[in-house]
Amino acid sequence: MEPGTGGSRKRLGPRAGFRFWPPFFPRRSQAGSSKFPTPLGPENSGNPTLLSSAQPETRVSYWTKLLSQLLAPLPGLLQKVLIWSQLFGGMFPTRWLDFAGVYSALRALKGREKPAAPTAQKSLSSLQLDSSDPSVTSPLDWLEEGIHWQYSPPDLKLELKAKGSALDPAAQAFLLEQQLWGVELLPSSLQSRLYSNRELGSSPSGPLNIQRIDNFSVVSYLLNPSYLDCFPRLEVSYQNSDGNSEVVGFQTLTPESSCLREDHCHPQPLSAELIPASWQGCPPLSTEGLPEIHHLRMKRLEFLQQASKGQDLPTPDQDNGYHSLEEEHSLLRMDPKHCRDNPTQFVPAAGDIPGNTQESTEEKIELLTTEVPLALEEESPSEGCPSSEIPMEKEPGEGRISVVDYSYLEGDLPISARPACSNKLIDYILGGASSDLETSSDPEGEDWDEEAEDDGFDSDSSLSDSDLEQDPEGLHLWNSFCSVDPYNPQNFTATIQTAARIVPEEPSDSEKDLSGKSDLENSSQSGSLPETPEHSSGEEDDWESSADEAESLKLWNSFCNSDDPYNPLNFKAPFQTSGENEKGCRDSKTPSESIVAISECHTLLSCKVQLLGSQESECPDSVQRDVLSGGRHTHVKRKKVTFLEEVTEYYISGDEDRKGPWEEFARDGCRFQKRIQETEDAIGYCLTFEHRERMFNRLQGTCFKGLNVLKQC
């Protein structure tokens, strides 16, 4: 019966322990079995129950492998999330940091399997895993993929203190390469403590987490950012069967892993670089980091450094390469600070000056010679300067003159002065003076001192004879600007306040007088035109002919003296009606003077451009502007109340005078309203509801009677 009972116990063993355990929670073995087994005594070496305890764990090994394959992509995704959490530390909760670096915890644990001392029972090499047991290797392989589960701390006592000691290169197996946190993977038979000096006054760090996976304990801790200069020291001890704990090793946070700085009190820019692994067997992470973020950070630092040093930041060329002579001259001008050390400065190359096209050397020299100030005329003449140097402007407060060296040019280059114009008036406007060296020499030997007193205008503010002979087209152009428009800004002759003038009683006679005067003026104008030898061409002969002159003036007067008050050339429509105040004066002795005839509170103007040349006047050719009253037919506006000689009388005493069409319309309207009222009184009751209902019933009764008669038939 004992074998039978033993056999029945073997069959009931799996049923009694048959529970669905998740693959990441392998079923716990019986007492004495562990993934980090203690050294077995001789009394337990031949116990067959220990061998049968591993059978339930082997049945769920394939579930573990299947889930490990499904969850294989999670470590890579988790690693990326952790990298970005370093960049945006405040965006992720601190409990996410507990998942950091679990993928390398087992590798660090395997790195300790090599015996470091003869005493194997006191070292971690005595706690090697049995790789032949599939129930043990499959959860460990699954942990290598970086899957990590969070639990509340039930057993272990962790105390956080700070200790700034030297680095311990021998204890680097458990530390993961992260900047602000640490993760430790320990068997359940080991006890861990974090020690620090209380006299340093450091406060505990961030939240602590202990995760238990079967016989393993994963301890994660977060460093306090305000105490990053303090290094926690981890003491790992092993508890033997007697209950005594012996120290196995220490683990200290290194400054490389925490990325400490000397100026930790000040905010630092984000760093996207990762530090290589500090333990053997773990592949180093990418030191390249995020090149885009690093590049942007470096650019921003360079920009801030330039701004702090006061350097001019590069700005785009707003003129697209085009620049004025003043800008080019300012580029060639020397700095007063450098002038004390070096009085000369080389001309920059064509590529240094901003521009789309490179100018030739000759064009540059011409531009420079045009900028030579007149102050150099007081110094020695141009022959005193070498041919390879061009004089520039004089520095203020300096006794020497800045020059531009053109020694690289071949041959002597002529020095050209300011371009002079043949017309003295235009040359004077451009800035010409009587002390110009090159223009002072006249080939005809004329005395320039006498001509220097002439400013280009005669004493009577008219153009000189020489200017008129040299530039007849300029005179016509000037006359075109001197328009006789009364509202012309250059020659404003319009009256500010309108005033009525005396209007002739006979408009027809005034028209005749004005037309006669215009004919006389035209004839005198044609006869008084100056005849100069310069007007010998065909066009000038046509301009001088009196017939053409008279026709052109008549044509112009026909446009100006139009009867249309809304004519744009002669707008005479009144803007505001007002009473007529008859005032004025008229001088018959001066027909050439301006005469303005104002009628109906608006000005009647006619414009004539005449070129009068009288022998008596000092200036034979002058421009005179006449505003003549044209031959207009004017009339006197009547007042609102007038008295006529013939008055029509209307007597209202008779009845026939009171009868009219309005009375007929009123009578017809009254008759029509009366007829409407009579019709409504006659047939208005037919539209009431009672009458309509009565008629409906009568018609309905008639119809039924007809139906009854048809039925009887």
From Swiss-Prot:
Molecular function via GO: protein phosphatase regulator activity
Family matches, as Pfam families: CReP_N, PP1c_bdg
Keyword Ligase: no
GO CC annotations, alphabetized: endoplasmic reticulum; protein phosphatase type 1 complex
Biased composition (Basic and acidic residues): 509-520
GO biological process per UniProt: ER overload response; negative regulation of PERK-mediated unfolded protein response; negative regulation of protein phosphorylation; regulation of translation; response to endoplasmic reticulum stress; response to hydrogen peroxide
Compositional bias (Acidic residues): 439-458, 539-548
The UniProt record lists the keyword Phosphoprotein: yes
Annotated region described as Disordered, given as residue ranges: 22-53, 115-134, 376-398, 434-472, 502-548
Residues found modified as Phosphoserine: S203, S205, S508
Keyword set, alphabetical order: Diabetes mellitus, Disease variant, Dwarfism, Intellectual disability, Phosphoprotein, Translation regulation
Composition-biased stretches (Polar residues): 44-53
Biased composition, class Low complexity, residue ranges: 123-134
Its job: Maintains low levels of EIF2S1 phosphorylation in unstressed cells by promoting its dephosphorylation by PP1.
Disease per UniProt entry: Microcephaly, short stature, and impaired glucose metabolism 2: An autosomal recessive disease characterized by microcephaly, intellectual disability, short stature, and disturbed glucose metabolism.
Subunit composition and interactions: Part of a complex containing PPP1R15B, PP1 and NCK1/2. Interacts with PP1.
Family: Belongs to the PPP1R15 family.
Extra facts: The phosphatase activity of the PPP1R15B-PP1 complex toward EIF2S1 is specifically inhibited by Salubrinal, a drug that protects cells from endoplasmic reticulum stress.
Protein name listed in UniProt: Protein phosphatase 1 regulatory subunit 15B
Gene giving rise to this polypeptide: PPP1R15B
